[in-house]
Amino acid sequence: MIVIVTGMPGSGKSKIVKEFEKRGFPSVSLGDIVREETLKRGLELTKENVAKVSIRLRQELGQNAVAKLAVEKVRALLKGSQVVVIDGVRSLDEVGTFRGAFPEENIIIVAVHTPPRQRFERLKARGRHDDPQTWEDFEERDWKELRFGIGGVIAMADYMLVNNGSREEYEAEVKKLVDEIISKL
């Protein structure tokens, strides 16, 4: 089984990924693949460079570029695990790449929605190098994600979590969701 986790930046995707990992299931982060590719190209890890590489990869390899780069990692992990989680799928082309590469696998899409203001505050607090510090940067990043096609992936989700309450409430919802998905093994 492949579990694709999607949502806008700062929505709470990593909580879902971490819950699967706590239960012994590995994950592949498409964002990490872009960051690795940025370093391979001799560029410093800045939000500008990561964004440029993300766009350049799609120009060079197609809209599903990052998924193509992840397929072999996912394949290797599936040899040792019943479930592999893929974090950060941003387009239906990427979903299609995984469906095409793994036709025998049950592929489940989990989306997380969090209101924009909450996401902005979380991203500012998170402090990763590519996190926006101004509302304008935040909106620009959101539009970039939407242009990649993330809205289509969210719309096609098998499960949708709304993360607009307390941390404890969301963590309880995540555990419940992971329990439900694992019960289908």
From Swiss-Prot:
Keyword Nucleus applies: no
Keyword Ribonucleoprotein: no
SUPFAM superfamilies referenced in this protein's UniProt entry, alphabetically: P-loop containing nucleoside triphosphate hydrolases (SSF52540)
Keywords of the record: ATP-binding, Nucleotide-binding
Positions bound to ATP: 7-14
Transmembrane segments: none
GO MF: ATP binding
InterPro entries assigned to the protein according to its UniProt record, in alphabetical order: NTP_hydrolase-rel (IPR022970), P-loop_NTPase (IPR027417)
Pfam families assigned to the protein according to its UniProt record, in alphabetical order: AAA_17
HAMAP family: UPF0200
Entry similarity comment: Belongs to the UPF0200 family.
Name this polypeptide is given: UPF0200 protein TK1334
Native species: Thermococcus kodakarensis (strain ATCC BAA-918 / JCM 12380 / KOD1) (Pyrococcus kodakaraensis (strain KOD1))
